[in-house]
Amino acid sequence: MPEMAKPAEGGKRYSLNYAAMYRLTNWDTVKVYTATTVAPTDYNREGTGDRFGGNAELQDTIATYQITNDKAFKIAIDRGNFEQGMRAKKAGEVMRYEMNEQIIPMIDKDRLATVAAGATAVSQAVSMTTDAYQDTLKLNEYLDECKAPLDGRVLWVTPAEYNKVKTAITTNILASGYNDKLVGKGFVGELDGVPVVKVPTSYFPTGIVALMTHRDALLGVRQVTETRIITDSEFVSGSILLGRFIFGSFILKGKEKAVASIVDGSAISS
């Protein structure tokens, strides 16, 4: 029995599902709760009352975000076409191809676009130079200054930018110390302790060649993830594949500076 040619799939490799403490309120609104901390005071050894300086009740900072992405698809597989095509177009396989080729990349692109916009909003977009390695170090510097933990940082790069960074390192006198870290670490490597994820250029907004963020800074919400295969429709003799996805991605309040980007200005101007 012939098989349907498989489309290129890659979405699962880049899926970004970061979470935080949040609650869905209205159908299109999500509230994120963050506990606030207090500054230490001097302990009063001579005090006759509360030597700790009084009680400060724990307060929650509440940030509200609106979910705007509401996407859907519908695919019909006519029974006649299915039989005459020697049953190559199996509904389950088509659904999997749709998810891997269209839906997962769509959501990943939205996440990356959110990070890119966030970096621009806080003026942490590095202009690309001829020294790709130094450009990448600047991203780490931004996250260092905002006290983002090293554990949890992720660097996404285009294939071309990855090659530039790798070339800069492997031709450096420190190459032997880095070569082993650029392979076999999961992802495609590790750079200064940060996992590196190589992503197709088409996933990035125009001009963006690299993005770095801490996982705690990016909130990815999937309110509705629905897929169905209908085999008893009165309108189609065959199968109907349906899908609906309501999702959103946000840079969390208080963590806005835990994102940075490298921008190729020539690509934007052209």
Language-model segments: residues:
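Protruding loop/beta-arch "assembly-hinge" segments enriched in small, turn-prone residues
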Residues: 1-24, 215, 222-270
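N-terminal "assembly arms/tails" that initiate or stabilize quaternary assembly
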Residues: 1-65, 224, 267
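Short helix/loop capping segments that flank catalytic or ligand/cofactor-binding pockets
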Residues: 40-43, 164-167, 250-251
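Long, hydrophobic/aromatic-enriched structural stretches that serve as scaffold segments
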Residues: 54-94
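Alpha-helical scaffold segments that mediate packing/assembly in large oligomeric complexes
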Residues: 79-148, 259-270
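Extended, solvent-exposed, turn-rich assembly/linker loops in the middle of proteins
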Residues: 117-187
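Glycine/small-residue-rich hydrophobic helix-like segments
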Residues: 185-235
